[in-house]
């Protein structure tokens, strides 16, 4: 029997809170939960007691790592809040949550404004066309400047940022804001932010309020022709008309309303929740989700409605200490019911829905069904991993796959005791299920277990979780860079594998052309006249692909090449798949050694923010790390230096920067591209590798 939907779809808001690390995102989310009545005591990130940050490592570091999806109710609306991490090592979590939310609130700090990670997250939100609004937090701290932040948003994010509030006071005198839409002042009387007075705009602010209100109305009427005409004819635009036009503009990604507050001091949070309801989209406001039919490959559309066939995306897998594997899902269409069977078309397997839960930040509510627009978690799935679709067996669809970046850093890891080996292997496999940018494999030559990830912090957190959650004590090696190899010119080469000594022989023979090529490995079969029988062709392809795991320079994976198989020969009796696989790998090795092979290294995009007086010193240091300065700009009393630096030169940089700037500099980096390693350094790397 179907449970009736409690709230209509148009009352749903699935939103993410995005920000730079330390912008106060978790505190802001906490306050939303507090005011919507889900939390009785406010959790402070400073005490490590925040409700959203439920993993121990997050509570220690005061940063958010796991995006938890939380449901709360505000003024008859259902708000599902997806908490996204702001640290660049966890960009994949941000991408993943952006994929399943409909709108977002970007939290900026009144002092730092648009910081490096804000830009990264903003670009990701642009990619997924997520409508968003901005909230300038920490208005109470030294150096808070709301108007500078709005200008930074326009310059650095190219956003049409339009304040719909302006602050009254700043730093320790911050006490409220002017609501530009309603043209009134709101003053906070207490520290819990629950007592507010609506007053007339203070005398000394009337001029600036009028100026900003005029600019806001102009920006809003530009989005609506009828209002534009009315405005040009000098008529008054009502509050309702402004709200409606602003909502339309936000949904079309044409305008970003900006608000202000201090979440820590409980000021400005409720108006922000009101704005989420007023201006951000419901699932009905966004285009229907598109996917492909697993058999025909045709495009399929699913509208947000309970009457459509069920389609759901698993956007996060988490291991819960009490109930095992949890799959966080977003239901796009139809109804997912407890105890039923569904299809995972990506894996081609049926899955049984064990239990359905709606998550509050750290407690869960069991439900019978999840409806279109809902976010929740499923217990009991066996084969489903992040990015998989779950759908109605009779109406299969694969919702678009999410693409995840390649890992750039690796470390060797070993258990402290022999007995821990198997347990470590199983635990690492579980962690890899949760996080597609984390990989684990065994190095065939040394027998070591290697883990790969997006940065030092990423791998630190993984090792930490191994020890805490899975109780595996382990030792880790020094971080290693994920070098790659490639070729610079096209060549032809032969691979011939012949064995004729007693018993059945082996015979495989092929000619290939290997060419540099940006992108994934491609294999083209250009054999004519049956020089090699069809059934042996895939074996050659496999042989080449396997051989490319270890290049000829220093045994690193080979990328950016394609292969054309154009000739060869076979033996009626002695040829086999195995022989052709070996011939393929021999041809690959021969071709690569003649094709000007080079070593590639990951180059990071680095942003360093330092006080003016340390700039020369820090830039000199970047140059000494083979860095290439890409530009700089002055921000409040500091310089923002942008540069490209090889990852191998960035290990331990945090400590160096701290000592060079007496703890006042900070930096962030993300992977940008692969680049050829200079010859002299290539020799060093090969020497190290051969030790």
Curated annotation (Swiss-Prot):
Residues 10-284 form the tr-type G domain. Belongs to the TRAFAC class translation factor GTPase superfamily. Classic translation factor GTPase family. EF-G/EF-2 subfamily. This is Elongation factor G. Pfam families: EFG_C (PF00679), EFG_III (PF14492), EFG_IV (PF03764), GTP_EFTU (PF00009), GTP_EFTU_D2 (PF03144). Catalyzes the GTP-dependent ribosomal translocation step during translation elongation. During this step, the ribosome changes from the pre-translocational (PRE) to the post-translocational (POST) state as the newly formed A-site-bound peptidyl-tRNA and P-site-bound deacylated tRNA move to the P and E sites, respectively. Catalyzes the coordinated movement of the two tRNA molecules, the mRNA and conformational changes in the ribosome. One of its GO terms (cellular component) is cytoplasm. GTP binds at residues 19-26, 83-87, 137-140. GO terms for molecular function: GTP binding; GTPase activity; translation elongation factor activity. The keyword Zinc does not apply. It comes from Clostridium tetani (strain Massachusetts / E88). It comes from the Bacteria. One of its GO terms (biological process) is ribosome disassembly. It is found in: Cytoplasm. Disulfide bonds: none annotated. Keywords: Cytoplasm, Elongation factor, GTP-binding, Nucleotide-binding, Protein biosynthesis. Its main location: cytoplasm. InterPro entries: EFG_II (IPR041095), EFG_III (IPR009022), EFG_III/V (IPR035647), EFG_IV (IPR047872), EFG_V (IPR035649), EFG_V-like (IPR000640), EFTu-like_2 (IPR004161), G_TR_CS (IPR031157).
